[in-house]
């Protein structure tokens, strides 16, 4: 009988958190975000933010989770 592998959730250490300002709203709930470090990132809204109808407008400060594998895209997880 083969051993069962444990399913692992994405750990917090797998993502990088960053803050930025929404510059532009694009189609399909995608946004262009300017990070505090000066980089531009394409970001989408996380599932919980969609469920709770949290609106994001240009000029809002947001917190992003960025994957270390593709640093040009991210997920918006919090609006300040």
UniProtKB/Swiss-Prot annotation:
GO cellular component: cytosol
Keyword tags: Cytoplasm, Initiation factor, Protein biosynthesis, RNA-binding, rRNA-binding
InterPro entries (UniProt xref): NA-bd_OB-fold (IPR012340), RNA-binding_domain_S1_IF1 (IPR006196), TIF_IF1 (IPR004368)
Subunit structure as annotated in this protein's UniProt entry: Component of the 30S ribosomal translation pre-initiation complex which assembles on the 30S ribosome in the order IF-2 and IF-3, IF-1 and N-formylmethionyl-tRNA(fMet); mRNA recruitment can occur at any time during PIC assembly.
The name this protein goes by in its record: Translation initiation factor IF-1
Family classification: Belongs to the IF-1 family.
Residue ranges occupied by any S1-like domain in the UniProt entry: 6-80
Compartment(s): Cytoplasm
Cell division keyword on record: no
Keyword match Cytoplasm: yes
CDD domains the UniProt entry points to: S1_IF1
Role played: One of the essential components for the initiation of protein synthesis. Stabilizes the binding of IF-2 and IF-3 on the 30S subunit to which N-formylmethionyl-tRNA(fMet) subsequently binds. Helps modulate mRNA selection, yielding the 30S pre-initiation complex (PIC). Upon addition of the 50S ribosomal subunit IF-1, IF-2 and IF-3 are released leaving the mature 70S translation initiation complex.
HAMAP family found in the cross-reference section: IF_1
């Amino acid at each position: 009988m083969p051993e069962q592998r444990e399913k692992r959730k994405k750990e917090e250490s797998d993502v990088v958190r960053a803050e930025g300002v929404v510059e532009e709203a694009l189609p399909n709930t995608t946004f262009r975000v300017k990070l505090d470090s000066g980089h531009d990132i394409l970001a989408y809204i996380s599932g919980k933010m969609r469920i709770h109808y949290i609106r994001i407008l240009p000029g809002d400060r947001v917190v992003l989770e960025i994957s270390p594998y593709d640093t040009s895209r991210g997920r918006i997880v919090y609006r300040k």
